[in-house]
A protein has these predicted regions:
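Short strand-connecting beta-turns/loops that link adjacent beta-strands
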Residues: 29, 95, 160-162
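C-terminal active-site "lid" helix and adjoining low-complexity regulatory extension at the edge
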Residues: 118, 128-132, 146, 150, ...
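A conserved acidic, glycine/proline-rich C-terminal tail/linker
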Residues: 141-145
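Protein kinase-like catalytic core scaffold
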Residues: 22, 71, 86, 98-99, ...
Length: 230
């Protein structure tokens, strides 16, 4: 139907005035595609541009993905006041956790490749902490995939006040981390060079990067699950 653009722009403008910062985005894309970060400095013209761009984007997807829609979500700042944005990802397959990791950056919107030397200490600290808390959060993460009726995917979340704030379920593979490793070239080189010391602190990172063993375990689990459940 016809969109009342000016009315929607007003609603978005009010939302920003309450929350300070927000993402306006499509509901079913990954890798920061179809996403605008708006804040109190965003003019109504900029808000209108973002909204019209997303409406056009949704219309182009409707033939193949009818459920495509636009959502507005409050931007969640890092709780520590560290200036870092921390993001957690857990790979789930048939009710089992295969792997998990945390990434971090000073940027509001970032990809794995954006991590560098300045992020290294925090990257190690977050992943060490994630390894320690995994047994406590495991059931919640598995439940998040289950309620979406998905048996395969990467559950993404923030952690605030020791609570998980779920963001989305992503495809598991094809990203920079699964192809090349974590961070930029300098960070990858550091992780390789210091493997013997770091593997004791952040075994999850090296398990994920050991592709031959990782995929062997993955396919063995698929075979076992299908043999016993189907």
């Amino acid at each position: 139907g016809k969109h009342n653009i000016s009315q929607e722009v007003e609603k978005i403008h009010t939302f920003i005035s309450i929350h300070g910062k927000m993402f306006l985005r499509t509901n079913n894309e990954t890798a920061a595609n179809g996403m605008f970060l708006l804040n109190k400095d965003s003019t109504k013209i900029e808000i209108e541009y973002a909204l019209k761009s997303l409406i056009q984007r949704c219309e182009s997807f409707h033939n193949t993905r009818k459920a495509t829609n636009i959502v507005g979500v409050k931007f969640i700042s890092s709780e520590s006041g560290s200036g870092f944005q921390d993001l957690y990802r857990v790979h789930v397959l048939f009710g089992k956790i295969l792997s998990y990791y945390a990434v971090t950056s000073h940027l509001d919107i970032f990809h794995n490749i954006d991590m560098g030397g300045n992020d290294l200490d925090r990257f190690i600290e977050l992943n060490r902490d994630l390894c320690e808390r995994m047994s406590k959060i495991k059931q919640n993460v598995l439940k998040a995939a289950k309620v979406l009726n998905c048996n395969l995917g990467a559950v993404e979340f923030f952690i605030q006040n020791n609570e998980l704030i779920f963001l989305e379920l992503n495809p598991m593979w094809g990203g920079h981390a699964s192809k090349f490793g974590f961070g930029n070239d300098k960070m990858q080189a550091y992780l390789k060079k210091n493997r013997n010391q770091l593997i004791k602190l952040i075994p999850n990172i090296y398990i994920f990067m050991d592709r031959r063993t990782y995929y062997k375990d993955l396919f063995q689990w698929i075979h076992y699950y299908c043999s016993t459940n189907l």
